[in-house]
């Protein structure tokens, strides 16, 4: 199975189902990874801080979990990007259920998003960096399409030897691409042009919030 079809597997179906249920996702994360996902859902409030008429890019959008913060008729451009056709289909169903008319779905790689330079106010990058073959390049692409002072909010798994759970995060195994370490993420962010990123960690999960300088 190719990587872009990985989420068509039973794992992808299960992952999409529990990601939409914060209580269940938190229980699974605590049990399997020893981390707390509350910050993931809390950080989605950044969507409501974007000014009227602003643009949000959600890459990878997955099944569209972050759409929970959008209201029908809201005057925002929301661009949901993913490489997985199955995830985009699930996101479409979520869009239709919620009656969201201003969400655009795009199938694209995280290092080649078809939007102009400096066109985006908020970039969401949830649970994607550890899946990408070049996560540092994905952050450079996020910086490219963000406006000066634009905001990046996201989460990722980080590899390391701090715990047995972290040792399970191995490059090119399952849906992992080239996951970075806890030290790599702030370094990659700063190299891409983000200033003073706020980093929080829970087990092997790392949450980041940064502005483009």
Where are these regions (language model features)?
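Conserved class I S-adenosyl-L-methionine
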Residues: 1-51, 65, 69, 169
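C-terminal alpha-helical "lid/dimerization" subdomain adjacent to the S-adenosyl-L-methionine
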Residues: 9, 25-29, 153-209
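Short glycine-centered segments of the SAM/dcSAM-binding site in methyltransferase folds
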Residues: 55, 150-151
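Class I SAM-dependent methyltransferase SAM/SAH-binding core
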Residues: 55-112
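Short N-terminal helix/helix-N-cap motif within the alpha/beta-hydrolase-1
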Residues: 86, 133-136
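A short acidic, Gly/Pro-enriched loop at the edge of an enzyme's catalytic core
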Residues: 111-122
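A short SAM/SAH-binding and catalytic strip from SAM-dependent methyltransferases
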Residues: 122-134
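A short glycine-rich, Lys/Arg-flanked "PGG" loop and its adjoining helix->strand segment in the class I
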Residues: 136-148
